[in-house]
A protein has these predicted regions:
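Acidic donor-binding loop of glycosyltransferase active sites
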Residues: 285-300, 317
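Acidic anion/phosphate-binding donor-loop and adjacent secondary structure
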Residues: 68, 145-148, 173-176, 182, ...
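A conserved mid-protein helix/loop that constitutes part of the nucleotide-sugar donor-binding site
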Residues: 23, 212-235, 248-252, 346, ...
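Nucleotide-activated donor-binding/catalytic signature segment of Leloir-type glycosyltransferases, i.e.
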Residues: 254-279
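Short alpha-helical donor nucleotide-sugar binding micro-motif in glycosyltransferases
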Residues: 274-275, 283-287
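Conserved acidic donor-binding segment of nucleotide-sugar-dependent glycosyltransferases
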Residues: 330-334, 338-345, 353-360, 374
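N-terminal subdomain of nucleotide-sugar transferases
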Residues: 1-63
Length: 395
């Protein structure tokens, strides 16, 4: 039987092999190749090829500004943080929308269905093109910009779609408040479980000596809540906090950490920067516990799902996380991890101390971690997406 032709669109994607940009769209595209002929359409970047085969996936990058060296709206990071970092980048937004629409219109007859990742800009642009599409809400595209013209555009996007998915139940609830599409499903992000594991352990990778390693991986931005994790180190001994990531709060958090280390008279916090997928595999495997202290940001943005927690699970790490956004879909308190309230500094420290100092609890969470990860393997997630797409196409 002839495979369907699937176009996957997004605005976060690796620019080249070994890039530190999130790769979940790439991994999904690779897994979907079992069911469809897959092409990915993403914004151009000065560091990326206009078209290439990346890890077996056909990738097209569209230009959106006459001066290509100024196409800096989407990378590194994401659109909203990039604008916050440099306000002038907001001038690139209309160019991006227009160019995305033009490319989607030009390609409208080449594909049977489009999978638009993020309502803004992909879903909204797609709603003005005739090709059938499903749209997936990932996080800030759902929880922020929900007034005025953006709410109307989001409603149009959800109404015109042949199907709507969200990566977590809390996000789906927000989408349903905007518009209830009869074809909707919660399908989380996935993880290549075969890629991660304790076999990638490297001894004394962080120069921690005999200290336990507490790991955070993610963008250094407000909603990640890293400042509360750093404060929690006041109440934790014989451990090193390793922070892997980059972002607008790096300088502020580094100063906070230096002050903390000075007060404790030890090197208990280490920043290692953004790392590649390959490097992260050993970083997870060489750590003892993973912490995700996310919060609701001032603009309403919150964690959509928390893919790094899934990678930590796949690496056999106990996870401690905030009850925030889509995290609660993945982490079940005292079953496969521990949950604390947002901004609860002593709560974070208490849970870390309990898990690290109680071998029975630690081993129980380690066993549950790997079991949880296997439920979210990309083969499982790709089948869910394919079944959903087949269902909505038939209707």
């Amino acid at each position: 039987m002839k495979k369907k032709r699937l176009l996957i669109t997004g605005s976060t994607f690796p620019r080249y092999e070994g890039d530190t940009e999130p790769r979940f769209i790439l991994d999904l595209a690779k897994a979907m190749k079992e069911y469809a002929t897959v092409t990915v359409l993403v914004p151009a970047s000065p560091e990326a090829a206009d078209r290439e085969i990346l890890e077996g996936v056909d990738v097209i990058r569209y230009h959106y500004f006459p001066i290509h060296s100024l196409e800096t709206l989407c990378y590194p990071g994401a659109i909203v943080p990039r604008i916050k970092e440099k306000k002038a980048r907001v001038l690139l937004v209309p160019w991006l929308f227009i160019s995305l629409y033009y490319n989607l219109f030009k390609m409208r007859k080449e594909y049977d269905i489009v999978h638009s990742n993020w309502l803004i800009p992909q879903g909204i642009a797609q709603s003005f093109v005739s090709t059938p599409y499903i749209v997936t809400g990932h996080g800030g595209d759902v929880t922020s910009l929900n007034n005025g013209i953006f709410r109307r555009l989001k409603r149009r996007c959800l109404k015109k779609a042949v199907g709507v998915t969200a990566v977590s139940e809390p996000l789906m609830s927000v989408l349903e408040d905007i518009y209830i599409n009869k074809n909707r499903a919660v399908i989380s992000m996935g993880c290549d479980t075969s890629f991660f594991g304790k076999e990638h352990y490297k001894e004394n990778l962080f120069g921690q000596g005999d200290k336990k390693v507490i790991l955070f991986v993610g963008r250094l931005a407000e909603k990640k809540g890293v400042t509360y994790l750093i404060e929690a180190m006041k109440y934790i001994n014989d451990a090193m906090l390793v922070i892997a990531g980059d972002g607008p709060l790096k300088e502020e958090l580094t100063q906070q950490a230096e002050k903390m280390c000075k007060e404790k008279q030890c090197e208990c916090i280490k920043f290692i920067g953004a790392k590649t997928h390959e490097q992260l595999r050993s970083i997870y495997a060489s750590s003892d516990i993973f912490v995700m202290p996310s919060i609701t940001a001032k603009d309403g943005d919150k964690e959509g799902f928390g893919l790094v927690m899934l990678e930590a699970f796949a690496s056999g790490l106990p996870v401690i996380a905030s009850r925030s956004g889509g995290i609660v879909d993945l982490v079940k308190d005292s079953i496969n991890g521990c949950l604390v309230e947002e901004k609860d500094i002593k709560g974070i420290a208490n849970k870390i101390n309990i898990v690290l100092n109680n071998e029975r609890i630690y081993n129980k969470l380690v066993m549950a971690a790997r079991s949880t990860a296997e439920q979210y393997d990309y083969k499982v997630i790709a089948k869910k997406y394919n079944d959903f797409i087949d269902k909505v196409i038939k209707e």
